[in-house]
């Protein structure tokens, strides 16, 4: 919605979830003819609030005109929001699965954690049964999600 200097703060780069969300971020920038700036892309080795805070600090030293931040996790988002509040910066933050209702996120993707956990467990049980019966089956499940704008 009018932002052009959008940062990405993700979890460990080796995780598929981080890579998938990074790919989505890069594709969105490309679709809107926005530059990809590696100085606005960060990867935490752990999903911790302090990592989001510290990356925000680095980000605004490099680019004080950053006008939106996407995080891959609500803990990282919490650190980002704390930094923004502390420095009285009005920058929208978008994240995945907002577990803290007090976070002032512009929007988040509700990944339906309950259904994700239940489906994962059921799939693991099915795989165990298939292995016992010498069956090899490829599983793919899509869990419904929702974008929640505040």
Which residue stretches match the model-derived regions?
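Short acidic/polar active-site loop segments enriched in Thr and Asp
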Residues: 4-6, 67
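Hinge/beta->alpha junction and helix N-cap segments in small-molecule ligand-binding domains
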Residues: 9-57, 70-78, 96-98, 110-119, ...
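Flexible loop/turn connectors
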Residues: 57-150
């Amino acid at each position: 919605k009018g932002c052009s200097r959008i940062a990405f703060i993700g979890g460990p780069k080796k995780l598929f979830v981080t890579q998938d969300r990074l790919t989505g971020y890069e594709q969105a920038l490309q679709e809107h003819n926005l530059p990809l700036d590696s100085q606005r892309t960060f990867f935490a080795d752990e999903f911790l609030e302090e990592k989001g805070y510290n990356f925000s600090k680095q980000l605004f030293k490099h680019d004080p005109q950053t006008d939106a931040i996407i995080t891959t996790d609500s803990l990282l988002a919490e650190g980002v929001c704390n930094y923004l509040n502390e420095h009285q910066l009005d920058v929208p933050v978008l994240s995945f699965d907002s577990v803290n209702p007090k976070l002032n996120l512009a929007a988040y993707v509700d990944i339906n954690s309950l259904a994700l956990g239940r489906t994962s467990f059921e799939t693991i049980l099915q795989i165990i049964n298939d292995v016992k019966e010498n069956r090899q089956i490829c599983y793919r499940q899509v869990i419904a999600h929702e974008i929640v704008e505040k």
